[in-house]
Amino acid sequence: MAISTPMLVTFCVYIFGMILIGFIAWRSTKNFDDYILGGRSLGPFVTALSAGASDMSGWLLMGLPGAIFLSGISESWIAIGLTLGAWINWKLVAGRLRVHTEFNNNALTLPDYFTGRFEDKSRVLRIISALVILLFFTIYCASGIVAGARLFESTFGMSYETALWAGAAATIIYTFIGGFLAVSWTDTVQASLMIFALILTPVMVIVGVGGFSESLEVIKQKSIENVDMLKGLNFVAIISLMGWGLGYFGQPHILARFMAADSHHSIVHARRISMTWMILCLAGAVAVGFFGIAYFNNNPALAGAVNQNSERVFIELAQILFNPWIAGVLLSAILAAVMSTLSCQLLVCSSAITEDLYKAFLRKSASQQELVWVGRVMVLVVALIAIALAANPDNRVLGLVSYAWAGFGAAFGPVVLFSVMWSRMTRNGALAGMIIGAVTVIVWKQYGWLDLYEIIPGFIFGSLGIVIFSLLGKAPTAAMQERFAKADAHYHSAPPSKLQAE
């Protein structure tokens, strides 16, 4: 399609704004702690929106509305599962992880935290977890770059090769320059843009059809199954869709936001903000797909692109219902969703290399400035590898991204959850949980037993592995138990205000 000047200008202004934030963050980045975790200085608002934006990729504005448009409201079970999982993660893990990482050598990364928490002198936990992060997040990054390239390709009529670099360049620049603060501040802007788009668009769709009741009648007339929450689903299918929520406990880029909060007491505010944002965004995405059924049913002449690819429902509605300036802002929300997740994943990969491999094994005495620049170079290296993988969007390696959410959820999720909740957990328990969870996901996905989403057995067996191997081996050292007790007491300490952190 021919790109309009207003849309092009809007995209360029947005991208320039993100890069400008990167330069502002650069001025506040004094050491490696600042570059990787923002000096643990994020307030509740930035913590909340950064966690949300880093979580919700382009799937929120393309995949979810497309699935609802194609199959009806029954596809919303995954949104319900994600909402529940995110809330439990905020409630049980967020504040505790913020405290425990600080009490365990001020850990900057998950591998660093595992090493300190379980006094792993062999550093096996650090190596395994860092390599798992590098493998899957590099592929994750490649997948995000493909999504950004597809957006530029379809919106601006670019070749895929040009779109590949155009889509990735801005994210790489502001992440390279500003590190964690740039990523978190841009996430906040991007999250605001996403919620604006997902509230405004379905409202205008409903108005365009003739109101809520009229829209619902049109949807029912097309197929009554569109409003059936149980359409084509059995108990296992519903549990599998809901099971996506288990992934939150083990996603390094989301957990990093908890670790970067200025205090565990501010987590309660952040939870309320983040969950409100998430519920509104998911409801908006579902509404875009759901009421899009009514709009395109009433306007079949406009439905060609959507009928060919249901994931374009948000894009087409934005271009049809709004003038090019507003449409440009709304379509920037898709780019925001892609960029916010990609930048977080690039930074997690960079920190895994710099903190958990370079500093831990090669340069223990490296200066803060050296680590910051190594971190920046690693952002660039990982990005270039991801771009190389994304150069062929049909690359089989990209298929491994389907393992990533379940893999992280099952391998890291139980370990993180038990590590902040159970003082009796040991290094062998952590290692067993990580390996059993990951292997279960891989094997279960290959054989597809019971048609059950592999994260569920992976999480269950990983948890059992933690408990069994922790109880079979030696008890944690006195120092480990004392450190856990101090961290737990600090977590439950009274906040400065009357608001309780629990």
From Swiss-Prot:
Induction: Expression may be repressed by PutA in the absence of proline.
Bilayer topology term: Multi-pass membrane protein
Keywords: Amino-acid transport, Cell inner membrane, Cell membrane, Ion transport, Membrane, Sodium, Sodium transport, Symport, Transmembrane, Transmembrane helix, Transport
GO cellular component labels: plasma membrane
Keyword Transmembrane helix: yes
Chief site of localization: membrane
Database matches in Gene3D superfamilies: Sodium/glucose cotransporter (1.20.1730.10)
Location in or out of the cell: Cell inner membrane
One Gene Ontology biological process: proline transport
Protein origin, superkingdom: Bacteria
PROSITE patterns per the UniProt record, alphabetical: NA_SOLUT_SYMP_1 (PS00456), NA_SOLUT_SYMP_2 (PS00457), NA_SOLUT_SYMP_3 (PS50283)
Catalytic activity from the UniProt record: L-proline(in) + Na(+)(in) = L-proline(out) + Na(+)(out)
GO function terms (MF aspect): L-proline transmembrane transporter activity; proline:sodium symporter activity; sodium ion binding
Annotated site, Involved in high-affinity binding for sodium and proline, chain positions: C344
Spans traversing the lipid bilayer: 6-26, 42-62, 68-88, 127-147, 163-183, 192-212, 235-255, 276-296, 320-340, 371-391, 398-418, 430-450, 452-472
Role played: Catalyzes the sodium-dependent uptake of extracellular L-proline.
Cited NCBIfam families: Na_Pro_sym (TIGR02121), PRK15419.1 (NF011948), sss (TIGR00813)
Family statement: Belongs to the sodium:solute symporter (SSF) (TC 2.A.21) family.
Official protein name in the record: Sodium/proline symporter
Organism, scientific name: Salmonella typhimurium (strain LT2 / SGSC1412 / ATCC 700720)
